[in-house]
């Protein structure tokens, strides 16, 4: 069957395309310039989406706002709601999405979990500094490649942190993804100066926080980055 889909989730858009399902529209953050855009993940144009008469709109509990999902539902637009909070949740969530769009899902193959590689903090924002919390997809990826995440205690999924506190935790690695904040070399140098004895590494943010068809290869790539740090001294 052919399902007319609008995806408001960048990870889902990438996954659908990998399955040869071309969305009728997506968000401007999906990095698909050839597809029509219907706003952003937090500010979708619900009227434009409804006008497309989709069979299904893919949303995510964390990525998208509840009020936008409710507005679409009130207009009679069918929703497929995803909630991926860990690497282990990916196969089940993708199986449900594949069923909703009528495709046979390719198997999700993850590399074996790795032994202890030390500790890490993964930053996601600057001004204020924010890090991944323990109960997030990205933190579960780090655990899978052998890095215990030590950003902060508590239930906050994206806690505010200060670099002095990060330094006190003495992480072996500080991970700087290219999104949602576009960390670059100048930020790496800034953090390296304040968190001595840690490797501060820039990584493709999609590999850390986008789940879906890329998950297996993303875990492999991130593991390879960490392998490259073995035996290397942190830059001073």
Describe every region a protein language model picked out.
Residues 1-236:
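N-terminal ligand-binding lobe of clamshell/alpha-beta domains
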């Amino acid at each position: 069957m052919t399902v007319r889909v609008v995806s408001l989730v960048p990870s889902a858009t990438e996954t659908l395309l990998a399955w040869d399902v071309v969305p009728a529209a997506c968000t401007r953050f999906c990095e698909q310039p050839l597809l029509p855009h219907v706003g952003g993940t937090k500010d979708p144009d619900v009227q434009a989406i409804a006008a497309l008469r989709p069979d299904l709109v893919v949303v995510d509990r964390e990525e998208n706002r509840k009020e936008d999902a409710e507005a679409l539902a009130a207009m009679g637009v069918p929703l497929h709601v995803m909630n991926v909070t860990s690497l282990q949740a990916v196969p089940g969530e993708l199986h449900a999405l594949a069923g909703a769009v009528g495709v046979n899902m390719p198997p999700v193959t993850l590399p074996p979990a790795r032994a202890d590689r030390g500790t890490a903090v993964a930053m996601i924002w600057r001004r204020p500094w924010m890090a991944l919390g323990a109960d997030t997809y990205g933190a579960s990826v780090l655990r899978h490649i052998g890095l215990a995440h030590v950003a902060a205690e508590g239930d906050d999924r994206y806690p505010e942190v200060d670099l002095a506190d990060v330094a006190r935790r003495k992480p072996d690695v500080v991970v700087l993804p290219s999104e949602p904040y576009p960390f670059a070399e100048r930020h790496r140098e800034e953090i390296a100066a304040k968190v001595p004895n840690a490797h501060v590494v820039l990584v493709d943010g999609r590999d850390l926080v986008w789940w879906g068809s890329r998950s297996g290869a993303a875990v492999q790539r991130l593991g390879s980055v960490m392998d490259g740090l073995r035996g290397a001294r942190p830059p001073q």
